């Protein structure tokens, strides 16, 4: 899907809430539409069953998105995998009392070096085990630019980006799905029963009809090869996630990155809990960042004031107060993953590479530890300062 369409859809979802009916999103869902309508009605009227299932409410990951600070896409994370950096960053995750991480694998890196990906991901899981952290890997990606040779290795702060996986021409042509299917089978063969996996996310944000069909086929294939680890779909909203229940999704997701108010966050949490009970399936908030009272950042308008900076404290206490699995974006302080946000100056994350934090208030709100201590440094990483400089933003915020 073109960037402009993705941004338009995201903006609609951010401003109106993920539970509103949008025909553009439901058009691809087919038979799932009736299920969506039924569950929405039950949740809206408080008709969800009182008893919640063990599967829905017994496990609550409190996690983060993890991408090393200087990796601009998943390919780079695995190509430049550094065990020392991994151990250091997992220590930061432990200090926030996290028990889970959501990470992207890379079909394109698997094509380049299958053995290296297996060895590096296995090492990552070993280190997470030592840190007491579970992992939810993402196999395919629905956001970003095309995974050309230039794009996957681009490290320029103004132009480097997340990449689609697989490429658009593969997604559009089922005759070319043999490669992704083989990759999926490879992953399931080696990791479907791995005790360190919290879940297997088959596809993140399958925007557009073609990628929806691709993701549905991959989900069905994963279900045929499933082990003990549950399957998930990275729905940007609840509509998108529910369309994959019939294909085998065990865990649903929603991505309330930039809600407009605390009331909107509370509304989201209320509905998620009600729908978990109705569906008897977990629904996790797998991407959340901060409240933005002005623009969401997905449209064409600039952000309001300092709403470009991290502010997890605006959402964390509300989320921590509810029994809902969640992952904030992101553990490491990084320029925005997607160019639409980066061009507006969006900065994400908690930790600088040296262990300083952007905001002590954020670290304390996420961890629940009001005595958390670290150096607070509200300054862009030196290697990314050309981003704020290019749009006339401050590189450092003074107390």
Stretches with model-predicted labels:
Residues 15-16, 102, 223, 287:
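Short, cationic motifs built from Arg/Lys/His that form the positively charged side of catalytic pockets
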Residues 33-57:
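C-terminal segment of N-terminal export signals and the immediately downstream linker at the start
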Residues 54-249, 279, 322-325, 334-336, ...:
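Active-site mouth of glycoside hydrolases
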Residues 212, 228-297:
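Glycoside hydrolase catalytic-domain groove-lining segments
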Residues 284-294, 299-373, 380-387:
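Substrate-binding cleft of secreted/luminal carbohydrate-active enzymes
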